From Swiss-Prot:
Keywords: Cell wall biogenesis/degradation, Endoplasmic reticulum, Glycoprotein, Membrane, Signal, Transmembrane, Transmembrane helix. Its main location: endoplasmic reticulum. Belongs to the BIG1 family. Glycans are attached at N145. The chain crosses the membrane at residues 282-302. The gene is BIG1. It comes from Kluyveromyces lactis (strain ATCC 8585 / CBS 2359 / DSM 70799 / NBRC 1267 / NRRL Y-1140 / WM37) (Yeast). This is Protein BIG1.
């Protein structure tokens, strides 16, 4: 029985050693929150939770603080299952539409380690809060199938959109008919651009994250991936200004009419202009001389060619007198 007892102990020890390794493969999910309009007081959370484990309750507090300002006309909740921090670096080019939306937003924060509770759909809680807090009646669920298109809306009513993409393939995996992880991220990025392009106005607030923890290769668990540091470590992002307030600033008073060509300093040329006469005296004299000579020649030609009265008339007159 001793060998069997030792074997059982070895199994227990092996299981205890294996458990941390398996847990190391479970990633806290990354998340992006960005808004077209300025949301005062949100940027402070970036410094407070940057690179720190963010409990789900704290994340919900930040999200509701952003939502409660009710300054957007569309609230978009994007769920990308399987998203990891490494995707923002390794597949940045496949997410360049999302990158541009974040870059041009007035308010944007990122959380790299959101510790969500598995199988807890926090989007439903946030959507319910949004609709209640901002008095929104319309909610649209989009399956996230990039081959499908939904009917765009043109009414200027505040809405909530939820986009649920299918899970991403694992790193290095190729799925028939879908492609690699890079291919799927790029297709989803284009679909997100399509969805955002159907919005009646650009005044949106977007939540982009994975609602489930993903597994990554062991080689990635020890690596540090910052989400687009060129954006989020830029000191100008610490300043709370509305980067998209151009319309309000560029529509004040009416601009007075101004011709394309400014003729205010134009000078009108005349033959009596002294400067013109001084600069072109020789040419003017030559033109006048040629003109006078031409006139004289024409008068002389007329005089030379003038026909004399016919003598035959005089003879007829004399004959009449004789008779």
């Amino acid at each position: 029985m001793q060998p069997s007892f030792m074997t059982m102990n070895e199994l227990i020890v092996f299981a205890l050693l294996l458990t941390p390794l398996l847990a190391a493969r479970q990633q806290s999910v990354p998340g992006l929150l960005f808004s077209y309009n300025l949301a005062p007081g949100i940027v402070k959370y970036q410094d407070k939770y940057d690179n720190a484990q963010l409990p789900q309750d704290d994340f919900l507090k930040v999200a509701k603080d952003l939502i409660s300002q009710c300054h957007s006309e569309t609230y978009v909740f994007v769920n990308q299952p399987g998203l990891s921090r490494s995707d923002f670096k390794q597949h940045k080019q496949s997410m360049h539409k999302l990158y541009n939306y974040v870059l041009t937003s007035s308010t944007t924060v990122k959380f790299e380690k959101i510790d969500i509770v598995q199988n807890d759909d926090i989007y439903e809680e946030l959507i319910a809060y949004t609709m209640d807090k901002c008095n929104i009646d319309d909610k649209i669920d989009i399956g996230g199938n990039v081959t499908d298109r939904y009917q765009p809306f043109v009414e200027a009513r505040t809405r909530v959109l939820r986009v649920d993409f299918p899970p991403l393939p694992q790193q290095g995996q190729y799925v028939e008919g879908i492609g690699t992880r890079k291919d799927v991220l790029q297709a989803n990025d284009e679909y997100l651009r399509y969805v955002m392009g159907t919005l009646p106005t650009p005044k949106h607030t977007v939540f982009y994250m994975s609602l489930e923890k993903s597994e990554v290769p062991d080689t990635e668990t020890s690596l540090s991936y910052d989400i687009w540091p060129e954006i989020f470590t830029n000191p100008q992002r610490k300043v709370e200004i509305d980067r998209n307030d151009r319309v309000a600033k560029e529509m004040p008073k009416l601009v007075p009419y101004r011709p394309r060509i400014d003729t205010e300093d134009d000078k009108y040329l005349t033959v009596l202009d002294q400067e013109f006469i001084d600069n072109h005296y020789g040419i003017i004299v030559l033109i006048i001389g040629v003109t006078i000579a031409f006139i004289l020649l024409q008068l002389g030609a007329v005089k030379v060619k003038k026909p004399s009265k016919p003598q035959i008339t005089k003879d007829v007159t004399k004959e009449k007198k004789t008779q």
